[in-house]
Every structure is written in structure tokens, then in C-alpha cells.
Amino acid sequence: MNKKTIPIKQVTSWSFSRYSTYKQCPLKLKLSAIDHIREPGNEAMVRGDAIHKLAEKYIKGEGRSLPPELKLFADEFKKLRAQYKKKINGMVVEDNWAFTKDWSETQWDNWAECVVRIKIDCAHHQDDETLIITDWKTGKFRPEMNEEYVEQLELYALAALLLHEHIQQVKPRLAYLDLGITYPEAGAELVFTRTDIPKLKKLWKKRTKAMLNDKQFAPRPNDKCRFCFYRNSNKAAGGGQCKY
């Protein structure tokens, strides 16, 4: 009697979070995204989520006063609130963008065809042809993560250019609410135009190829293992799935 072959599960869709997790450790992605062994939240994550909700509510006109957690960007938030009230085409707050394999727009819950999912904190117009995408950050700015920051901004830019045909250029950025700084800083913005679309598509195809074709998900020991929920020494807390 032939034994039944159990197909090897692979990653069939991705987000920037999944991509960055895979770069750090393929096994970590498998355990979280395929095996669905969820890591418990922590205080920093809970605080970050709460502040994101404060930003969303204020921009959307809920409440009169600016929450103190947002005070370092007070002028920015007041302008965003006013622009949101005008319902300008292209401005979104806490939005979900989804694409198929060939980068056609689709629905987030199109489980059969959606391959790329992107969460947007805020996107607003600088002028009629320029869109600024902002990702609100809490906590520290880490210069050593420059490569990852740029990759994230490139993904935002590609998605925005594909979704909004009237937009000619996109300026994506990270805004650190606890520090009052943006990355890139004012005057040194990353600017993407419609001519960048083919290049960005090729970049992301190359970057995600290994992840989407992986059938082994080998662990990748690194300096972050000691903090990983799945580390061998964390069995008592529900981890321990990794030998390292």
C-alpha cells in the first residue's frame, strides 16, 4: 500500500512583515505564518497599537484635543485632520492595499489570488500630483536598519503609484512619534516617480523569490535568537520549536 504524500506547505502570499521575518529567519516565518504558532504580544506592541489608534481617530476628526502622545507632530496632525475633512481623492488613513501576483489591484480577502498585502497608516497629498505616505513609528530609530527602512518605503511607493494613476510622484517616510523625527529627514526625501514602477516590480520579484519558493525553511541563527519566542530555551512559555 502506497503511503500518502503530505504536500509541503509554502508561503503563497506576503506582506512587508512576512518578508522581513523571512530575511531574519525562514523557520520563524514558517512557525508564525504557516504553522500559525503565534507569538504573544508585549508592552511595546500594545502601546504602539494604542498610539496608532489615537492617530487614526484624531485625523478622522474624533475628539477635539490632540492626544499628548502625538504632540511632537502637532502641526502635522492638524493639517492632516483638515485635509481628511475635505475628502481629497487619494488620502487614506489606516487602509489596506492588496495586489495579485502581477500587481493588479484586488481585495484583501481574495484568498485565491491576493499575493501582496500592504497596511497603510496615512497617505495624503502634498499637491495634485504628489502623494506622501507616512508610517507612524513608536520607539527608537535604528540607523543599522537603514536597508530595511528603504525597502519598506520602496514597497509603499510602488503600491501607491499602481493604485493612483493621477499621482506622478510618491514620497514615503517613517515618522517617529516619540522622537519627533522623520526618516528620511525633511529635505532629503526619497522620491519615486512612475518611471520607477518597472524597476520596483523587478526588485520585489527578486527579493521575494527565495521566500515564495522555499520548502525547507531552515533556521538562520543570528544575534536576535536570544529574544525569539521560538528559541529552544523558551519551551515553558510555549516556544521551543527551534533547536537554537
Each model region followed by its residue ranges:
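Short alpha-helix boundary/capping segments
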Residues: 42-43, 144-151
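Nuclease catalytic cores
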Residues: 12-63, 94-95, 227
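An acidic intrinsically disordered interaction segment
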Residues: 11-24, 113-125, 193-198
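Short amphipathic alpha-helical segments and their helix-coil junctions
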Residues: 5-10, 27-39, 133-137, 204-212
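Catalytic cores of nuclease domains that cleave nucleic-acid phosphodiester backbones
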Residues: 54-141, 165-173
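Metal-dependent nuclease catalytic regions and adjoining charged, substrate-binding loops involved
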Residues: 9, 13-14, 100, 104-105, ...
